[in-house]
Amino acid sequence: MSYTPRERVLAAMNLQKPDRVPLMCQFSIGSMMQQLKPSPAEFWYDGDVFASGLVELCKRFKFDGILVSLHGHSPDWRNNIVSFNKLEEGKQEIVFADRSEFHSWTDLPMVKYFNKPVHKGIDDID
């Protein structure tokens, strides 16, 4: 009998014997970028773009699931952009009021704050 990915994982988690060992993967951000070639900033910030990418990778590699790493997802990130520059294929610069960010297919976003952040003492944190 052939199992669906869900049935396979549930069988294994219930200590039953599935048709094969469930296979999952947690991709690095760099690996996901290289495979999918998305807009780097959208992939980082837009939860729907990120989720669609994970589903695509799961199908492409015939995984039974993907272990999700969380990134900078923010539903209103576009509303806070001062400027958005496409530097070249796979490289983007986003400027927000307090910082600039460089997004690429090859690395995590690099963030540069315009003013040095104020570090709170432990007693100042709720």
Locations of regions flagged by a protein language model:
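Catalytic cores of TIM-barrel enzymes
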Residues: 1-126
